[in-house]
Amino acid sequence: MILKYPYATEKASMIVERDGQLQFIVDRKASKGQIKVAIEKMFDQPVTRVRTLMNNRGEKKAMVSFSNPKAAEEILSRLGIM
């Protein structure tokens, strides 16, 4: 499984409201293309950009931007986070 879980912190919530970006913890070996395809397939929303980083605990975090500005809030409400 490429997507492990959504990264839900106070800072991540501010980024959703400000930029419309979602953050996910993903498999360390997943590429940006694989992450994009997995998110588009799971949530039926077109992804415009995927940025990744490795945190100090060895987890890979993906920041995902959507073409629809309200897509991130819609996805979080479907997941029951927001």
Curated annotation (Swiss-Prot):
Q: Which family does it belong to?
A: Belongs to the universal ribosomal protein uL23 family.
Alphabetic keyword roster? Ribonucleoprotein, Ribosomal protein, RNA-binding, rRNA-binding
Give the protein name, as stated in the record.
Large ribosomal subunit protein uL23
GO CC annotations, alphabetized: ribonucleoprotein complex; ribosome
Superkingdom as given in the UniProt entry: Archaea
Q: Which terms does the record give in the GO molecular function aspect?
A: rRNA binding; structural constituent of ribosome
- What Pfam families does its record include? Ribosomal_L23
Query: rRNA-binding as a keyword?
Result: yes
What Gene3D superfamilies is this protein classified in?
3.30.70.330
Q: What does this protein do?
A: Binds to 23S rRNA. One of the proteins that surrounds the polypeptide exit tunnel on the outside of the ribosome.
InterPro entries listed in its UniProt record: Nucleotide-bd_a/b_plait_sf (IPR012677), Ribosomal_uL23 (IPR019985), Ribosomal_uL23-like (IPR013025), Ribosomal_uL23/eL15/eS24_sf (IPR012678)
Record's PANTHER family?
60S RIBOSOMAL PROTEIN L23A
Q: Which Gene Ontology terms describe the biological processes this protein takes part in?
A: translation
Q: Which HAMAP family match?
A: Ribosomal_uL23_A
Instruction: Provide the assembly information.
Output: Part of the 50S ribosomal subunit. Contacts protein L29.
